[in-house]
């Protein structure tokens, strides 16, 4: 596998990062991560000569971590040009951003950036230098995580026609987003509508962003095709489950040093993220309770031996609370008023509004260390809020391990190649990658683990009605 060569272009300044001097550290960690990312590195090696992304100008909005740096270098090795920002104000690893900037890639990401900065950086990843003849250059692909880059172009284009769509922000984040759009429209009244039609498609990483895409398409608002990377089996059943199983506890431990054994850990939501989170807590001998709205998921939790309760009941009994739903106000102000002194509250879903953090602003906040706060209630009770309700594994830790991110990012790279090279095959809509590509990613990942795959005989393949080389399961199969 060929590692990317890092070069330092002279007079390059198209970036906003914390500290360029961290680049050597970042580069060393990138080299280590490459050895743990067999799927992604194999894709890089397979397609490097063909340059399938030559001409692609990718706007990337995804956590600026060491693993993402390997993804960026892979996209570039396949011919793409990229501009990058983080999709979360706390998830950037500053040494990773420094390494990417030092290599000459435009990156706009600082751990702990403000929301105003966040939306400014999201605009910056759509702003390319003019070409040699002075003509404007625009992004033609988006690689998104949570859907913010996609949202920005769509909402901004609507605001050009009807400014009233920016009149009623529902959160602090929307206030910053709307103000940022107004600021750019004041300078260029067609900033968004010039860029939106240039986009050939988007590949979306996470559950929350995929939900947004399906909703936009249902409402007739989606302007370009999208590939739902999240629902590739080698993404959702691995990144979401096994990634969270390792990174959740890492984030909580780094933030609090709490002893988990014996504690009541309340896991809100029992999808793939919730399943991994519950397994992690049980592995450290917590008493795991689960809250769920879906009777099927609730039954799964019960059959695994978890106690299924409501949040109303759990609030006054739990020691550690983790939201994993992708929904809104799963832990409310009223729930937190009932909690024990020193209860730990955190989120591992994409957005911070799973916890009603805005309602806590009325109380005294005592910062313990970065991304760890005591919220002091009028009666003197304190709860510990991690990462201000944003992703605890990335805000307080370093996120998922490289190996599991290799599966996700191999899928992202394949999806970018497919959508860029075969745009005409994809009218506006939301698509998933075919199963044979899912199986390909799994095969590439297995090599690192020295696994031995059994090969079907011709008779066996004929008996179950599949090809010897797969795919082995029908599209409707639930892994």
Curated annotation (Swiss-Prot):
Binding residues for substrate: 65, 145, 205, 235, 239
This protein's UniProt keywords: Cytoplasm, Hydrolase, NAD, One-carbon metabolism
Single biological process term from Gene Ontology: L-homocysteine biosynthetic process
KW DNA repair (keyword) present: no
Predominant location category: cytoplasm
SUPFAM superfamilies the record matches: Formate/glycerate dehydrogenase catalytic domain-like, NAD(P)-binding Rossmann-fold domains
Entry EC number(s): 3.13.2.1
Cofactor: NAD(+)
Annotated PROSITE patterns: ADOHCYASE_1 (PS00738), ADOHCYASE_2 (PS00739)
Recorded catalytic activity of this chain's protein: S-adenosyl-L-homocysteine + H2O = L-homocysteine + adenosine
PANTHER family recorded: ADENOSYLHOMOCYSTEINASE
Purpose: May play a key role in the regulation of the intracellular concentration of adenosylhomocysteine.
Protein name, UniProt field: Adenosylhomocysteinase
Protein source organism: Janthinobacterium sp. (strain Marseille)
Gene: ahcY
């Amino acid at each position: 596998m060929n590692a990317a060569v890092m070069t330092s272009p002279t007079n390059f300044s198209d970036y906003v990062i914390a500290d360029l001097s961290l680049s050597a550290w970042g580069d060393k960690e990138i080299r280590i991560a490459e050895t743990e990312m067999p799927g992604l590195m194999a894709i890089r090696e397979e397609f490097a000569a063909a340059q399938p992304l030559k001409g692609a100008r990718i706007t990337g909005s995804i956590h600026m971590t060491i693993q993402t740096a390997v993804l960026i270098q892979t996209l570039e090795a396949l011919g793409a040009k990229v501009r990058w920002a983080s999709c979360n104000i706390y998830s950037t690893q500053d040494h990773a951003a420094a390494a990417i900037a030092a290599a000459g890639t435009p990156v706009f990401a600082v751990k702990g950036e403000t929301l105003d900065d966040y939306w400014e950086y999201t605009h910056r990843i759509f702003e390319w230098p003019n070409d040699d003849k002075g003509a404007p250059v625009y992004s033609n692909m988006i690689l998104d995580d949570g859907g913010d880059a996609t949202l920005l172009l769509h909402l901004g284009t609507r605001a050009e026609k009807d400014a009233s769509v920016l009149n009623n922000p529902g959160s602090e984040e929307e206030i910053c987003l709307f103000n940022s759009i107004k600021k750019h429209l004041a300078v260029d009244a067609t900033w968004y509508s010039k860029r939106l039609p240039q986009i050939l498609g988007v590949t979306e990483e996470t559950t929350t962003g995929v939900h947004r895409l399906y909703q936009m398409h249902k409402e007739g608002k989606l302007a370009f095709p999208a590939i739902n990377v999240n629902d590739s089996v080698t993404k959702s059943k691995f990144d979401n489950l096994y990634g969270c199983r390792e990174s959740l506890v890492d984030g909580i431990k780094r933030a609090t040093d709490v002893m988990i054994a014996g504690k009541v850990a309340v896991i809100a939501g029992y999808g793939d993220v919730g399943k991994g989170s519950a397994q992690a807590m049980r592995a450290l001998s917590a008493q795991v309770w689960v809250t769920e709205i879906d009777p099927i998921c609730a039954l799964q939790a019960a059959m695994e031996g978890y106690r299924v309760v409501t949040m109303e009941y759990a609030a006054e009994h739990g020691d550690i609370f983790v939201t994993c739903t992708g929904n809104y106000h799963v832990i409310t102000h009223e729930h937190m008023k009932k909690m024990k002194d020193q209860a730990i509250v955190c989120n591992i879903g994409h957005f911070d509004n799973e916890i009603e953090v805005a309602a806590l602003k009325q109380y005294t906040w005592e910062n313990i260390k970065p991304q760890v706060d005591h919220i002091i209630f009028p009666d003197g009770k304190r709860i510990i809020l991690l990462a201000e309700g944003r992703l605890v594994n990335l805000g307080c830790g370093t996120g998922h391990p490289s190996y599991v991110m290799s599966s996700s990012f191999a899928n992202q790279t394949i999806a970018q190649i497919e959508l860029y090279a075969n745009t005409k095959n994809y009218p506006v809509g939301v698509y998933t990658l075919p199963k044979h590509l899912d199986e390909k990613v799994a095969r590439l990942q297995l090599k690192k683990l020295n696994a031995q795959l059994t090969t079907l005989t011709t008779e066996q393949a004929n008996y179950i009605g599949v090809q010897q080389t797969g795919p082995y399961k029908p599209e409707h199969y639930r892994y």
